[in-house]
Amino acid sequence: MSAHPGSADHSSPSAAPHVPARASRLFVLVAGEASGDLLGAGLIEALRRRYPQARFCGVGGPRMLAAGLEAWYPAERLSVMGLVEVLPRLVELLRLRGDVRRRSLALHPDAFIGIDAPDFNLGLERKLKAAGIRTVHYVSPSVWAWREGRAARLGRSADLVLCLFPMEPAIYARYGVAAHFVGHPLADAFPLVTERAPARAALGLAADAPVLALLPGSRLGEIARLGSDFLATAAQAMASMPNLQLVIPAANAECRSALQALLDAAALPAARWRLLDGDAHTALLACDVVLLASGTAALEAMLAKRPLVVAYRIAPWTYRLVRWLRLMRTDRYSLPNILAGRALVPELMQEACTVPALTRAVLDLLGDASARSVQVQEFERLHRLLHGGGSEAAAAAIAERIESPAGPA
């Protein structure tokens, strides 16, 4: 692969590379999971509208590939979570990161854009920044929740941090880090008022039947820890509500296989559940209540205006380390509760995440229209807060950075 045209003064981290003609823009992007793949695809499309001849290389998933990414590796190679879980794959991840660094140095792109995956991307960004490559980190780590010291580390790694949530730039300002709120692209993917009937028709669901969506995670480890309990919860809810239907979107083929195996073992009535290939968006719009693993799915359910119950269970040793090291800065885990600043949706974490507790929370929401209404009304307010331009705003901030010789703060 030939080097990207242009030369740079590599004598210091602040050295600005030569800015080539727009037609020859080159961007390297690295995303490590399904949510990053979604953000990366939107960003590629927005950047291409500015630079029609641009080239995009790096690590991404199916959405980024469809948007035009030349993939060096699939995003799943980076998808690992937890302090303990990463250890068996550490050598592989370090080797992969070294290869991405070498490729990026050879190409010398207009910008390297790390999308989330901070434990993989920040060290990589720091080395590329030192080589005179402009670096952008898209999606702030959850510094408002744990390991706030990462905010200072980002300033050493990234020339620019693109924040999805409005409370984040103020944290970075305390560390002198350039950070911009660009809004969350998912806020533009859902209307403020959503309709249920078209989604149900698309999935072949009865218009008047109660529907529960199950989203146990987009990682195999999450499905292993939560999938069986989610299905057991669904079985108990179905016993209480004989007309209850289930929709279960699988993030990818591996997740589908894992979920299918759990469904086979659970022996739920086949006529009452649907396992979907992706299509979480439609599943959320079709349902009445969502039971999901904490993460981006909670934000998507919030934006779909669907009442939800959040659950999560990490590996026991990771949980003990987090508690022992006092890494957590918040007693709220899900984005709806963090954004609302209160316990808006039920959260059942670690020891509290049991089948009886999950079942009670799900049935309480399914059976209480006023409780659902309280969540939905607040979801509408929070949706408005997250509008900021999304992918277009992110592309504009990147364009401003690469087109300025010094790079604006």
Residues of each region from the PLM?
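Nucleotide-activated sugar donor-binding and catalytic core shared by glycosyltransferases
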Residues: 1-409
